[in-house]
């Protein structure tokens, strides 16, 4: 079942997905794989997911690796990331 998220909820869902995988610092995850997995749950398409990943990287929540093909969470902002997820991700 696909759910339609607004921009803030989608960003929180991306952060939550990467956090559940335990990808902090140099332990990174491929963006394409993440877009495919989230595409099964999120009604928004993969391009929107990739756009939100770039936005989160500009804000410092995410670190891009390997010529922007992989991503991990910024360990320096761990508390802010956890608060952002709790504040913006609705229980579904």
Segments from the language model and where they lie:
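Short alpha-helical segments that sit at the start of domains
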Residues: 1-25
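Short acidic, hydrophobic short linear motifs in intrinsically disordered regions
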Residues: 24-39
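Short amphipathic alpha-helical interaction segments
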Residues: 41-58
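A short, conserved structural fragment
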Residues: 57-67
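Minor-groove-contacting beta-hairpin "wing" of winged helix-turn-helix DNA-binding domains
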Residues: 69-74
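Short, amphipathic alpha-helical interaction segments positioned at domain boundaries
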Residues: 77-92
């Amino acid at each position: 079942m696909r759910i339609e998220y607004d921009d803030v909820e989608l960003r929180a869902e991306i952060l939550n997905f990467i956090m559940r995988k335990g990808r902090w610092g140099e332990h990174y995850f491929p963006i394409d794989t993440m877009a495919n997995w989230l595409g099964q749950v999120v009604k928004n398409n993969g391009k929107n997911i990739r756009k939100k990943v770039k936005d989160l990287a500009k804000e410092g929540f995410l670190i891009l690796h390997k010529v922007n093909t992989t991503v991990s969470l910024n360990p320096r902002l761990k508390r802010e990331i956890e608060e952002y997820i709790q504040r913006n991700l609705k229980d579904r």
